[in-house]
A protein has these predicted regions:
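Beta-barrel outer-membrane channel/assembly domains of diderm bacteria
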Residues: 2-3, 8-134, 158-168, 172, ...
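Long, well-ordered mid-to-C-terminal structural blocks that present hydrophobic/aromatic surfaces
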Residues: 298-346, 387
Length: 513
């Protein structure tokens, strides 16, 4: 029977007209990381204001010791230099033994695999204009710290890059970070998915000269009234904490109804550059300004940031010094925030200034202990990177000093001592250790920190690296009654937190192909 069927099938194939096709080349790349780490003091709290001891690492529900695994796999389907498609998966980070992180017995967690990127890459026919469409990484440049203080995200959007010549280029993008996430919770604010989109538009103009790079950029955003809302709290969903004031007070007659019922406007602009004409000396800088105007002064935020780096490359390493300054809150919760607003920070972004205080680890180790950005701080630092006296072994050493730029009076609102008469206060935290971006700390002008870090890398094979990181941050928080200390309110005394320093050591095995 099979032979009888095969004869007509072969005959049919013979009469099908030939179709021209081009082979698609599939390219795979990826990174495997297995890591062991041990540390303490992640929140800088030994005992909280209620006398409760903080156990474990102090953040993210982690123990002092954790073991983790993360895999990233990217598959590129390349038809030609002008056309390709890419899918980029991330599995983990899985915490060994933790069920909701996919690491418990059976390793059958269902929430640890995600699509990080999925985009189409193509050249407009007859030109060198490259267009990328879909889920992709879009980021703003920073040649000094190597990590944007404003926007670096995996996001859905379209980016277009135009190389005018060897000196001038242009990248334009539109991205939609949020849309259709609002659900009417019975308060009658608005129907589901109404006025809840966030759209951003950006321009980056890289200028490359002999020994000099200059890149001005600008980004404009429109934020729907319900994009970040939960109930009567404009920022209550948690999505907008990066552009929200740390603590704000709305007039009582504004609470319980729409504060704006319109689109808010966000704007950022910056200039970054570096000079390498006097090799081996390099000078790099970055300056950013940003603002968000919701239509209600109390909800607004605007600020700026600037940094400078000088380094000198030698045979045995590259020593450098650097500094930064970022504006801080003025102590008045009725006029919004004076810190630089931002949108997102990517876990592929690695700061050259800090390996522990901000986004700085090369692996999946603990970092961003002080915050994902440097908003509301100033500081100076020194480092030696690529320090090497032995083949395949290199080190990076850092020392940083931090001081807050926020008014000390803000601490009294945040910790619950002060209220704003005739107003209702809102916040996404209630103490110094959970008021900065994504759980970082909030430093006032009377608070200081010092960071000491060592990172060592040994190349076991061409594609396998052993990475060891050891970091320590000492915190000097003003525990007087006028800042973060204990206080009396309504006949009750609330004591100060008992503090400790933060430290962490991790060992990572990184396979990259």
């Amino acid at each position: 029977m099979k032979k009888h069927l095969a004869i007509p099938l072969l005959a049919a194939l013979c009469v099908v007209p030939a179709v021209e096709s081009r082979a698609v080349e599939f390219k795979a790349r990826g990174v495997w990381i297995n890591m062991l780490e041990y540390g303490d003091g992640g929140s800088f709290i030994r005992k909280d204001r209620h006398g409760n001891s903080v156990t474990g690492w102090g953040r993210w529900g982690e123990d002092d010791f954790e073991a983790k695994t993360r895999v990233r796999l990217q598959l590129d389907a390349v038809a030609s230099e002008a056309l390709s498609g890419s899918i980029y998966f991330e599995i983990g980070a899985s915490t060994w033994g933790r069920a909701n992180r996919g690491g418990a017995l059976g390793a059958d967690g269902t929430n640890i695999t995600k699509v990080k990127h999925a985009y189409l890459d193509w050249l407009i026919p007859g030109t060198d204009i490259r267009t990328r469409m879909g889920l992709q990484r879009i980021f703003l440049p920073d040649y000094a710290s190597e990590a944007s203080q404003v926007f670096d995200a995996d996001v859905a959007g379209i980016s277009v890059s135009v190389p005018f010549n060897e000196t001038v280029g242009l990248t334009a993008f539109w991205a939609r970070p949020f849309n259709d996430n609002w659900t009417d919770d019975g308060t009658g604010y608005a129907p589901d998915n109404y006025l809840d989109n966030v759209d951003i538009f950006g321009l980056v103009l890289p200028l490359t000269f002999d020994g000099l790079r200059l890149t001005p950029w600008a980004m404009l955003g429109m934020v729907g009234d319900n994009a970040f809302r939960a109930g009567n709290d404009y920022y209550g969903s948690g999505y907008g904490t990066d552009i929200s004031p740390a603590w704000y007070a709305l007039r009582n007659d504004k609470v319980g109804r729409h504060a704006t019922y319109a689109y808010g406007t966000a704007f950022w602009a910056g200039l970054t550059g570096d000079i390498t004409a006097v090799d081996p000396f390099r000078l790099a800088w970055s300056a950013n300004y940003g603002s968000f105007d919701s239509g209600v002064q109390e909800l607004n935020r605007s600020g700026w940031y600037a940094s400078l780096l000088a380094e000198y490359k030698l045979d045995w390493g590259t020593p450098g010094i650097y500094g930064w300054y970022s504006s801080g809150d003025d102590g008045n919760p009725r006029n919004g925030s004076e810190r630089l607003p931002s949108f997102d920070y990517n876990n592929e972004s690695t700061s050259g200034f800090s390996g522990f205080g901000t986004l700085g680890t090369w692996s999946i180790g603990r970092d961003a202990v002080l915050g994902y950005t440097l908003a509301g701080t100033w500081g100076i630092g020194a480092r030696i990177r690529d320090l090497s006296f032995m083949d395949k072994l290199s080190h990076t050493i850092r020392v940083n000093f931090y001081n807050g730029t926020n008014a000390p009076r803000m601490a009294r609102y945040i910790k619950g001592e002060l209220d704003a008469p005739g107003r209702t206060g809102f916040s996404y935290g209630n103490d110094f250790y959970n008021l900065n971006t994504n759980g970082g700390i909030y430093l006032t002008q009377k608070d200081y920190a010092a960071e000491f870090g060592l990172m060592s890398s040994y190349q076991l094979y061409d594609n396998l690296r052993l990475l060891v990181e050891a970091n320590y941050i000492a915190l000097w928080l003003d525990q007087s009654s006028t800042v973060w200390g204990g206080f009396h309110k309504n006949g009750t005394y609330t004591p100060a937190n008992s503090l400790e320093d933060a430290w962490n050591v991790n060992v990572s095995f990184i396979y990259k192909f």
